[in-house]
Amino acid sequence: MQPVDTYTGLHFTVPAGNDDLGRPQTCTIDADLYKPHSAGPAARVPAILTTNGFGGSKADQAGLGMAFAGRGYAVLSYTGLGFPDSGCKISLDDPGVDGVAASSLVTFLGGGGTAPYSSSDVAGAAGGPGTLEVDFTVLDDAANHDPRLGMIGGSYGGQIQFATAARDSRVDTLVPLITWNDLRYSLAPNNTSLARGVTYADSAPGTQKIGWTGLFFGVGILDGLQGAAVDPARNVGCPNFVLEACQAKATLDTLGYPTSDTYQLTDRVSVAHYIDKVTVPTFLIQGENDTLFNLQESVATYRSLKARGVPVTMAWQSWGHSGGTGDNTGAAPGELDLTGQHIEDTYLGLRIRNWFDHQLKGSKVSTGPEFAYFRDWVPYTGTAAPAYASASSYPVGTRRTWYLSSADDLVTSRKAVLPGSTSWSNPGLGAPASYSEVSGLEGQVSLPAGVTTPYDTPGTFGAWSTPPLSSPVDVVGSPTLDVQFDSPAVALTQAAGPSGQLQVFAKLYDVAPDGSKTLVHKLISPVRVADVTQPVHIELPAIVHRVDAGHRLQLVLASTDAAYKNAYAVQPVTVHASPTSPAALSIPVVP
């Protein structure tokens, strides 16, 4: 690594679309710049723009800034709008607000304008305030202040990349980690009636994730209070969020599902709805352990980009918003470290470095397979590369089908299906009878063992299990379920709208020989059935999981879940086992 010069407390005042009243607004941005000491007008380097995840700040990317500056990049790390110490309200990575603001930073990195800073460290010598003009980046078009530039960041810092690239063609490549495709699905999923990707039909709204939405608003409001001195107006009206966000939260809290007004916001801030404007090579990285932005979101973005001929690769890493694998709250050992001298010693760190070197420096290095995924059952030492399997594209493997039979069995042949029925009901009044997780806390903080054990209350769910497996089954991808529900009571209420429609939560358990059960990464699949008289196709969460020999795979259809807004009315429901038209569970399996 080469020596790095730093400029901290860079201050920008940039245009950022319109405020809640439709008036043009400017916002302040706080940033730090990391520069290779040798970079200059005669030794120009590519640029990287990065920002924080939700509730974070520029400081979160300091390690990345130092690491990549030491490898020949100028890195600008900034605090996103609405977070301390940048101004304006949180607008959820809106291309017309956050994307416009980021575009001004692209201009700065292309030599357009200057920015004051509070301190510097150049060649190991600390300095006081000054003004910085960038004259050390590679320019693709000097007249348009167009630097050779890539973006990287996770979660909220992932979506901003799409928002910026959609507004600014000067961005050359993206590396978004653990971010969303469609926020309507992320915050209120419905895993049936999917029109495309994870985007469900407006007429088939999802079910609110009460844990995640509550956590986000709490964090955002707290950030507004902490940053009040920077921009007191951010706490006026809807506290530290654009007005539409408060309105959407009120709708979700009241109804438990989104409406057309909610969609106007979520569609505007989701790449699913403007992906035709994203045309640059993209390296998607998504987390296997993530109940906020699950693997289906990355698949939706991957497929949309690939269908339009945009170069795209996808990796599924071990960790996400819900923690890591085993005792790790973050990346597995040797998987990802972007903070120092050991980038090349981690599987994804090396791939990201090579990606930028190839896309921004033109280096003839491998950018890796189009699809790769972490397998937590593979032992290794050092780099996590041995734990990653790869493929030339997604999906992978073949599908195996089990049919729902009587006696709560899953069988592999239609002929083996025995007639019967399984019935259950929710408690009503919105009360949960099943538990999957404490959203946002599990995997991040230590919780009592009993608190983290998923459960389903007898009489409120249906379950079907395979016999003990004779050999391991490796599941990679999204299982699906085709099923017909029978609920005369709901058939009478569903015409009244979403509140009268059947709610079901589908999930897969790994059942050990001793009867203990594992809900893989606490992932479940909420479904709101628009018409209970018609067959339903359900997409369960994508997983990467080995079901060991001697274990059983169990499908559960629950009436409620404590992490979601549940039905108020009592909804008795039955699934009939029929040899002529059995419900079918399809599992993607790799050798």
Question: What is each residue range found by the language model?
Answer:
Residues 291-297:
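Conserved alpha/beta-hydrolase "acid-adjacent" motif
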Residues 288-290, 319, 560:
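Acidic beta-to-alpha connecting loop that harbors the catalytic carboxylate
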Residues 70, 85, 99-102, 108-144, ...:
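Accessory cap/linker subdomain of secreted extracellular hydrolases
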Residues 40-140, 146-147, 326-338, 501-503, ...:
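Cap/lid segment of the alpha/beta-hydrolase catalytic domain
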Residues 1-43, 469-471:
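N-terminal cap/lid segment of alpha/beta-hydrolase-fold proteins
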Residues 278, 284-286, 290:
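Short beta-strand/loop motif that positions the catalytic acidic residue
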Residues 305-331:
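Catalytic histidine neighborhood in serine/cysteine hydrolases
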Residues 332-333, 337-591:
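C-terminal, loop-rich substrate-recognition/catalytic regions characterized by aromatic stacking residues
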